[in-house]
Amino acid sequence: FRGQNILGYRPYADDVVDYFVQKSISNGIDIIRIFDCLNDLRNLQEAVNATNKFKAQEGRGEAQVALAYTLGDAYSLEYWTGMAKKIEEMGADSICIKDMAGLLVPYKAAELIKAMKEVTKLPIQLHTHYTSGVASMTYLKAVEAGVDVIDTAMSPFAMGTSQPATEV
């Protein structure tokens, strides 16, 4: 969900975020994937804290911080590895590289995964879309580089703007 914005497009109070996370975990959602479209970790801290609080109470729940992958001069390996370190420090259980536009290409994925694995012990999950037609190869290179989890979709729902097919 969208951190302080939960599932909407405006910020909510900390107690509302806390209650949303509590209800999510108590109703069976184990992985709380939290992101901010601008990768502003301040907007994610309350959700991470809430997940960790209810994980301690319920015995389950994982705070997964998702980084919105994008291109540009500002988004160097140093940027991504710095974010990985901060995510680990803030108490997250795992990291998801969320490539919602399908911009991540195979060899860049391998480079990114290797670099992030060098700076964090957290599991890394990769989520990409087939929009540019290279997602399957991106996943292959990410797996070779040591990514822990990849997101896929069943073939009737896969490809196009979705994820690569699970069966392929």
Language-model features: locations:
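Catalytic cores and adjacent flexible loops of soluble metabolic enzymes
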Residues: 1-168
